[in-house]
Amino acid sequence: MVADSVMANMDSLNKLEEIGGKRHKFPAKGGTHQGRWCSGNLKAAVQDSVTANLEKTRQGVRILVVSGERRGESSGRSKYNEIEIHRTNAEKKLKRTVHQWRPVIDYSEKDVWEVLKRHKVNPHPCYRAGWNRCSWAMCIFSTPKLFAGIRELYPEDFEALRNDENVLGFTLDNKCNLDEFVGDTESCVYHGDKEAIRSLITGEFTTDDIYVKGDWLYPAGAFHGAEGGPC
């Protein structure tokens, strides 16, 4: 059912491309979704579309959207409310009540890790492999160190991104191309957790990997700040 909604969005996108073409630019490194269209169109709008169009959520329902933003991540998120009416709320027309709750809004990064530690939850392979942030794989806000990690683990994808710069005639960063941006920066990849790297390369992560069976350890990417992703 969710797949049907996503496919409908893709059909609409194809029609829009026929009318006005594609953007032919990377998202802007800005704070608003108008220029940074990736966050709005590829993340928020997808969830909104599913909620508004899926038969089981379209009308006569009460929905709680739970998300993990923290005020300490950025000045923008510091202004977020813990609980509020979600943008897909449509009580009068469709009797659809949608609230949003951010349960960890006032948590520090250490608070979050302590919750995972208490329940022996295995951190995402990204963190265990050295990434300080589990965001889009090649987020426009990624630092040179993070892009160097992409270049190491996903050389074909990195090359495709370089090629996109040439095809579009625009660079990912507004001051230099990808090669200049990354340069000879050392990769963020931590090679001490082979299983994490295997999961990232293969995309395999099973239910058996959810919990840590031995001692819980902070991942290599912990406590390196929130830089490298949109806020």
Language-model regions, residue ranges each:
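Nucleotide-activated chemistry modules centered on ATP-dependent adenylation/adenylyltransferase
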Residues: 1-231
